């Protein structure tokens, strides 16, 4: 009896003195606990992101609850600011973000080309092949790009359901839409530039349609929030190239904001994430990336942050399967690959901006 007591006491002592086993998903590598233990020694992960802190809040809370002792230092900024800050810090050789998470897919991939660590996430088998680039950069979301409009001021019969319909509507009612249409300023917004280029690739008549839209005077902004606010207030009537995730979240509490998914083609954006090579918190960075891609993390994004999941096994309709059932063949995902880099070449970028400014009358 005494010996049994001693054995039990020893077992209890060992259990209490050993690190707690983390609650990571089944199917992860057998040595993944070493990554967890390493992350706890590092104590934090620094994330540079274009996803605002409020939207990312539930994800951060879920991560810190899953991995106690690993804090998330979350820095949100617009895509241009993120790119410039990261480049400057890397050039100076100082500390920077452990993880980059950006909606500007092209500039994120450009950064990944030079600065990403190679890491084969155990979650990559759950992702579409187009969302994984060289085990370095990962697409993390599945977000349709939409039109928004003011429900009070745009009759239901006038709501455009394609890019052609949008251009025809505005060109036929230039007085009504004079300075009432908004989109991104592609010179100030990295996301705006990338989406415009993707429109150009998808639509041979893109610049002609843009010129028709701009006949009444196009209002350009650098943020989605400003565009939604101005359409809701009536200062603008229609906005295009808006992230559907932000629009759907806003529309839940704003009955004035309408959303139209174009039926000719609907671009699908995927926020790109990568781990910085040689970063001080490499284990914590791996935990964060894996958590974002995991069923748990994706469920939080889809059902709490209103950001559609890139997986197809998430409860509810806010994932790839749900979007496919709603929009079918119109969906046009933007792949995470080298094609994103083409118009970041200086000569091509400048020439493209010149064409855009001519068509947009800017």
Label every PLM stretch briefly.
Residues 29-46, 50-71, 147:
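Short, polar/charged alpha-helical segment
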């Amino acid at each position: 009896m005494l010996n049994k007591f001693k054995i039990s006491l020893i077992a209890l002592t060992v259990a209490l003195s050993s690190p707690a086993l983390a609650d990571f998903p089944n199917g992860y590598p057998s040595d993944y606990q070493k990554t967890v233990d390493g992350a706890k020694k590092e104590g934090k992960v620094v994330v540079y992101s274009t996803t605002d802190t409020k939207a990312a809040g539930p994800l951060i809370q879920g991560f810190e609850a899953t991995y106690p002792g690993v804090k998330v230092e979350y820095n949100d900024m617009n895509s241009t600011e993120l790119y410039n800050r990261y480049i400057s810090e890397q050039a100076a050789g100082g500390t920077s973000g452990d993880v980059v998470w950006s909606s500007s897919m092209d500039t994120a991939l450009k950064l990944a080309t030079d600065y990403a660590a190679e890491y084969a996430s155990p979650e990559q088998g759950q992702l579409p092949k187009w969302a994984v680039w060289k085990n370095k950069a990962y697409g993390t979301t599945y977000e349709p790009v939409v039109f928004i409009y003011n429900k009070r001021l745009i009759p239901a019969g006038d709501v455009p359901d394609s890019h052609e319909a949008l251009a025809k509507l505005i060109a036929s009612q230039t007085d009504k839409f004079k300075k009432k249409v908004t989109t991104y300023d592609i010179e100030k917004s990295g996301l705006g530039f990338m989406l415009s280029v993707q429109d150009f690739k998808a639509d041979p008549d893109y610049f002609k349609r843009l010129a028709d839209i701009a006949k009444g005077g196009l209002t350009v902004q650098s943020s989605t929030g400003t565009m939604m606010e101005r359409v809701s207030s009536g200062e603008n009537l229609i906005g295009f190239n808006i992230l559907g995730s932000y629009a759907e979240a806003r529309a839940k509490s704003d009955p004035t904001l309408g959303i139209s998914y174009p039926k000719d083609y609907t671009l699908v954006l995927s926020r790109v994430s990568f781990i910085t090579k040689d970063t001080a918190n490499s284990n914590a960075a791996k935990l964060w990336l894996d958590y974002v891609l995991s069923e748990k993390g994706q469920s939080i994004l889809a059902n709490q942050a209103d950001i559609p999941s890139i997986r197809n096994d998430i409860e509810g309709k806010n994932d790839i399967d749900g979007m496919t059932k709603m929009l079918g063949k119109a969906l046009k995902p933007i792949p995470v690959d080298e094609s994103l880099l083409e118009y970041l070449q200086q000569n091509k970028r400048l020439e493209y901006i010149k064409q855009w400014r001519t068509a947009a009358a800017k």
